[in-house]
Amino acid sequence: MAGPPRLLLLPLLLALARGLPGALAAQEVQQSPHCTTVPVGASVNITCSTSGGLRGIYLRQLGPQPQDIIYYEDGVVPTTDRRFRGRIDFSGSQDNLTITMHRLQLSDTGTYTCQAITEVNVYGSGTLVLVTEEQSQGWHRCSDAPPRASALPAPPTGSALPDPQTASALPDPPAASALPAALAVISFLLGLGLGVACVLARTQIKKLCSWRDKNSAACVVYEDMSHSRCNTLSSPNQYQ
């Protein structure tokens, strides 16, 4: 009787397997633009479009320490990071949301990506925002390729380039004169270790002999030999 139910489950599993790629594709996030260059004080629009079941959407600024800029959910008051408070506007719904960032500063330069909150988190391709000074706006060009997560540029500043004279004035590496001092320290540590070993050996011998007959000749000879050996190691060199 167990055979027919198993055979009925097989077509159901195959149907689920066929529908899984379509469900994952439906959760893809479309983001535009890929790159934009704006002067200081201007605004930029970032659009996040997705289809399928969606709980909400984040806009994150990538970098060494990713930062959530906004969180938007239909019917809920949007959450905005303190740095962008009063500079963010929304239009549309969470399925097709346009985020407008106003009064951009040089420190706002970075890569921003849409993160759709679904059964599995899905990310957009990212938008590279280059905020430049007005006189240098023509120096920066955007490519049509989506930005990479690691392509976070630093805010353009004129003082970022090192002074050639300062760069050539780096301190030289330490000379080899530190080698004798290192050898002296190593020799001192070796001598200290040998002294501690001799003290421990004599202590162990005394404990061993106390367990045996104290009149035993073997213990007396062994202890005398250990004592003479430690004295030989600790005696100074007459030829130095």
Curated annotation (Swiss-Prot):
Sequence repeat residue intervals: 145-153, 154-162, 163-171, 172-180
Keywords: Adaptive immunity, Disulfide bond, Glycoprotein, Immunity, Immunoglobulin domain, Lipoprotein, Membrane, Palmitate, Receptor, Repeat, Signal, Transmembrane, Transmembrane helix
Cystine pairs: 35-142, 48-114
Subcellular location(s) of the protein: Membrane
Transmembrane intervals: 181-201
Region of interest: 4 X 9 AA tandem repeats, potential spacer function: 145-180
Lipid-modified sites (S-palmitoyl cysteine): 198
Glycosylation site residues: 45, 96
A biological-process GO annotation: immune response
Residues on Extracellular side: 26-180
Tissue expression remark: Expressed on T-cells and natural killer (NK) cells and their precursors.
Subunit structure: Interacts with SECTM1.
Function: Transmembrane glycoprotein expressed by T-cells and natural killer (NK) cells and their precursors. Plays a costimulatory role in T-cell activation upon binding to its ligand K12/SECTM1. In turn, mediates the production of cytokines such as IL-2. On resting NK-cells, CD7 activation results in a significant induction of interferon-gamma levels.
Protein name as catalogued: T-cell antigen CD7
Record organism: Homo sapiens
Gene that specifies this protein: CD7
